């Protein structure tokens, strides 16, 4: 690798000696590869079109055959072939201080960025090309690209060096184009329905709104601890109290938790709050929003995800947590009549392993659901009516005070969205937060803490409100058929790379 770098540094220095800059300041582009291929694909083989173009891209391939060369360059939108003749380039070189055909052969490597001027041509073999009249070096690459046939076989390297992954793997580039499109569509969809996008603090004095461990930092001037937000919920609810009836925030969330194919400590979500609504209204909103996003991004409401066919066109199933556990496991939690010991004994006899930390029937129900049911929910399914002890911010169910008006949406065996009829009773909310604080004091670092300012806001008065959170990264996984969350985050958090030796540093031929 160091020999290749040394050779390329020599080429960069040769440009300097000829009076050319190997790292250009700018280049004025007139067209993209996508525009040219779409606009001039109709040309007959061998036909020229006299349109002056200036185009730039990274060199991905080159073939030199005597006095003719064919290069392939890629920009953000696609690829195009360059047709280069020695006579044409050298004629221009005579009349102006330009780089020659020989310079091209000797200096340009795969991986370099070059800019070219020329006209449109379709070769005799039917390849749309730029007939180049002059060229410029825009950025000399000092390191070779991964082998084009084998690409990046090390999956970890794809994540660590995403720039290489994007160069050699068109599918990865498409993933992030889809991600950008999806996020733009969500914002537009909500804006058109008169939701107002709000920005809430990332640094917070209290980390609330979810059961999760926060990242902690320190503000030097104020000499206080601060937390990276684990949710936007409590601040968005304050905005509803303040009179904004339809609000949302799409942004980054930070949770100091494990890393897996489904979890990254830094992730993106959208939280949506709508006054005068309940969890049924938010269910309808969720179904409409995600269905529209799927259709816009995939051109179909039936998609393939990891060898599973998922149909978004049918009405989505809605089923209570108790009923879905009964359906998939045969366990009837109502038959326990509130007796936790009986439930634990029956589950043990059924060879279902349960954490010894489980201390309520509601938590036990949730544990069985997560262990035995969740992964089987492939088609879009709203699981509704959750235990109150795992939902401290949700409104109690009017027919069963041990449950709350909450749903989670599951697709392809993963949770994609979480929503409530929000708890707006300040007295009840204080009791729930006090219970959470006692759990936190007892060692549960994911339990909620008491947020006095939020409780004061509730006492001012919050209208009936439905709240919803959607995991953007998991949605992108579905839209792009990606098996891991790391595939859809540009630079996911990874374990530190272990290297046995320090990388060699070569300075002998640095560009002067």
Curated annotation (Swiss-Prot):
The keyword ATP-binding applies. It catalyses: tRNA(Lys) + L-lysine + ATP = L-lysyl-tRNA(Lys) + AMP + diphosphate. Mg(2+) 1 binds at residues 408, 415. Pfam families: tRNA-synt_2 (PF00152), tRNA_anti-codon (PF01336). Mg(2+) 2 binds at residue 415. One of its GO terms (cellular component) is cytosol. Binds 3 Mg(2+) ions per subunit. It comes from the Bacteria. Its main location: cytoplasm. It is found in: Cytoplasm. One of its GO terms (biological process) is lysyl-tRNA aminoacylation. Belongs to the class-II aminoacyl-tRNA synthetase family. This is Lysine--tRNA ligase.
